[in-house]
Amino acid sequence: MNLPLLLLITILIEIHALKDGYVIYKNSNCKYSCNINEKWKYCSPLCQKKHGKTGYCYFFACWCTDLPNDVPIYGETGSYCWSNK
């Protein structure tokens, strides 16, 4: 009885899990750069466009919070910036 309930909870958590991280350009592993003097101005709208809650400039790159699992973030495909153009 408890096993099916535990399995259902695990599946629901996995489906609705959100993540934080540096968003990257499509078909690359390159972060969006930003101006740290304008902490929210560029990054927050960018992160919201990618269905995150908000974002801010951190170490000269856009850090987003509460991103869906299907949005790629820096580090998932390596630690170097590259392009498939």
Swiss-Prot record:
GO terms for molecular function: sodium channel inhibitor activity; toxin activity. Keywords: Disulfide bond, Ion channel impairing toxin, Neurotoxin, Secreted, Signal, Toxin, Voltage-gated sodium channel impairing toxin. CDD domains: neurotoxins_LC_scorpion. GO terms for biological process: defense response. Residues 19-82 form the LCN-type CS-alpha/beta domain. One of its GO terms (cellular component) is extracellular region. Its main location: secreted. Disulfide bonds join C30-C81, C34-C57, C43-C62, C47-C64. The keyword Transmembrane helix does not apply. Residues 1-17 form the signal peptide. InterPro entries: LCN-type_CS_alpha_beta_dom, Scorpion_toxin-like, Scorpion_toxin-like_sf, Scorpion_toxinL, Scorpion_toxinL/defensin. Expressed by the venom gland. It holds the Pfam family Toxin_3. SUPFAM superfamilies: Scorpion toxin-like. The keyword Signal applies. Belongs to the long (4 C-C) scorpion toxin superfamily. Sodium channel inhibitor family. Has the structural arrangement of an alpha-helix connected to antiparallel beta-sheets by disulfide bonds (CS-alpha/beta). Putative sodium channel toxin. This is Putative sodium channel toxin Ts34. It comes from Tityus serrulatus (Brazilian scorpion).
